[in-house]
């Protein structure tokens, strides 16, 4: 059987909020090393990859590997019934067609027990090649979310230009254009407020803001976000989940001749 207990249950609630608007259903791969999810979004434009390591859970047991087909909207609805302070336990028998979710209030006086039907999903795993990136920008996640939101009022796409001294986000549309430049910060007291850039060569790429705004729903998971870019390969937007793993989004750049469309 599979059983995982998470004292900080709010992490799971935040993960589902970050996934459910982009993906309708996905296969949760459960193994002794942890929980993994990989899925294209419903329009096959972006890819999501989630890792929650077993040691990040307070207790974790997995007797044999499971592939659980989950409707993320349904799971999100059930998790909304959990309080932010609740301890969440996930439980499934080896060949079960349901996943049990148990929410315990911290004072132990209230226990909620839900059972969610699982789905049969035929999922192909895509190999994501490890690679070096020309530009890696680490910045406050709230700042990235604000930039994507602000520029989506101007246009549908953002041009991200990365140089040694800073990173620039630009958008243009019928009402005009907007540019936001963040300089690399050298002496910030708090690491999560810093803008750090590792650059091998300058990069300028265009991305659909609609998808970036979906990705920024993961902002509550991490105070920082990392953007990894190289010419002609998908952008990686990574949110670290403290002591547990990460949530990565992949988005291919828009090709030059598409930009007018």
UniProtKB/Swiss-Prot annotation:
Phosphorylated. Phosphorylation at Tyr-211 by EGFR stabilizes chromatin-associated PCNA. Keywords: Acetylation, Disulfide bond, DNA damage, DNA repair, DNA replication, DNA-binding, Isopeptide bond, Methylation, Nucleus, Phosphoprotein, Ubl conjugation. CDD domains: PCNA. One of its GO terms (molecular function) is damaged DNA binding. GO terms for biological process: base-excision repair, gap-filling; cellular response to UV; cellular response to xenobiotic stimulus; epithelial cell differentiation; leading strand elongation; mismatch repair; mitotic telomere maintenance via semi-conservative replication; negative regulation of transcription by RNA polymerase II. Residues 61-80 bind DNA. One of its GO terms (cellular component) is male germ cell nucleus. The keyword Disulfide bond applies. HAMAP family: DNApol_clamp_arch (MF_00317). This is Proliferating cell nuclear antigen. It comes from Bos taurus.
């Amino acid at each position: 059987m599979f059983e995982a207990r998470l004292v900080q249950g709010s992490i799971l609630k935040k993960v589902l909020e970050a996934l459910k608007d982009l993906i309708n259903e996905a296969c949760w791969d459960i193994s002794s090393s942890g929980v993994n999810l990989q899925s294209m979004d419903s329009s096959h434009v972006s890819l999501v990859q989630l890792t929650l390591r077993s040691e990040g859970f307070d207790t974790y047991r997995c007797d044999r590997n499971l592939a659980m087909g989950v409707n993320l909207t349904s799971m999100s609805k059930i998790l909304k019934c959990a309080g932010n302070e609740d301890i969440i336990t996930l439980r499934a028998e080896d060949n079960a067609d349901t996943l049990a979710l148990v929410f315990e209030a911290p004072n132990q006086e209230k226990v909620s027990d839900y059972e969610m039907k699982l789905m049969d999903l035929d999922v192909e795993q895509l190999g994501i090649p490890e690679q070096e990136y020309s530009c890696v920008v680490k910045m406050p996640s709230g700042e990235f979310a604000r930039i994507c939101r602000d520029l989506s009022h101007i246009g549908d796409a953002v041009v991200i230009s990365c140089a040694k001294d800073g990173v620039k986000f630009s958008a243009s549309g019928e009402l005009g254009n907007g540019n936001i430049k963040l300089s690399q910060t050298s002496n910030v007291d708090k690491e999560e407020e810093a803008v750090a850039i590792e650059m091998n060569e300058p990069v300028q790429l265009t991305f659909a803001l609609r998808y970036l705004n979906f990705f920024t729903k993961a902002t509550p998971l991490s105070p920082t976000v990392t953007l990894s870019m190289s010419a002609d390969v998908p952008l990686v937007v990574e949110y670290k989940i403290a002591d547990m793993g990460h949530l990565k989004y992949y988005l291919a750049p828009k090709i030059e001749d598409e930009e007018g469309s």
